[in-house]
Amino acid sequence: MAAPTQLPETAKPKHSNQSEAGPAPLASPTAPMPRPASHLAPMPSDHPDFRSKSARLRCQPPRTNNCGTFKQPPSVAATSRPKPGNPFLQPPTKGTPPPKKKKKNHTEGCHTHEANPEPNTKHTETEPPIISHCPPPHPGPTATPNLLPCPNPTSSFCQNTRDSPSLPPQRPNMVHIPETPLQRRHSPSQIPIRIPPSPYNLSTAKTYYYLQPPYLPILSHEIHFIVPLLCPYEHHTHNRAARREPATLENNPRHRSIRLNYIPSHHVPHLRRRQF
């Protein structure tokens, strides 16, 4: 077959939007195709070259026969069982359905809820016995499947102080703060406050006894009553600055730096003053 005759350059039709230099030269058919700029990145793992042969067979597009029904790829039909949501795999239409597996006894395997589970001996002849590879639970009446034996059962850190696995651990229902000699003996110096159970404190209802106002713990603004016992000089300076000249407390940096630097700094950090 003769090759088509090449038109001379002057006879080729020239469009108005073409540049004067002529059309772009065509790539030769033997030259490799230009690769995109992303060729420096590694190919993804689902690229067909990286898949094994069985994976490539499994990922084929659906093939149909003349009737329009799906044909199963050979590897899928041989290796996997029919799943209800997969259009490639059809459920078996003839033959008896496979026998259903017997439910596993809950004492077999690792996750047991009893201290000493009995071995399952009710196996049929067609079903081989299930061999458990788990270590036996800890011996003794207090053994549980996932907890070590408790050295001190009365400790609050012990996990085994439960009456049954469904009940929460026993906690004291009432916290009693004993009276000190500073309190009057026969006065209602403690008020019971009932705190109901909630999902935030993760405990049962508790009753706390809070101290009444004449015997509250000393607050930071009441510290000048006991400061003479701690540091007489700072007590004297604080009282002089607070009682005689209240304005100097804000204006004089000496008084501002002295005034109770050491009291709130441990437990009330936002009241801590600058130390010069």
UniProtKB/Swiss-Prot annotation:
Residues 1-132, 156-176 are annotated as: Disordered. Residues 106-126 have a biased composition (Basic and acidic residues). It comes from the Eukaryota. Belongs to the UPF0328 family. This is UPF0328 protein ECU03_0010. It comes from Encephalitozoon cuniculi (strain GB-M1). The lineage of its organism: Eukaryota, Fungi, Fungi incertae sedis, Microsporidia, Unikaryonidae.
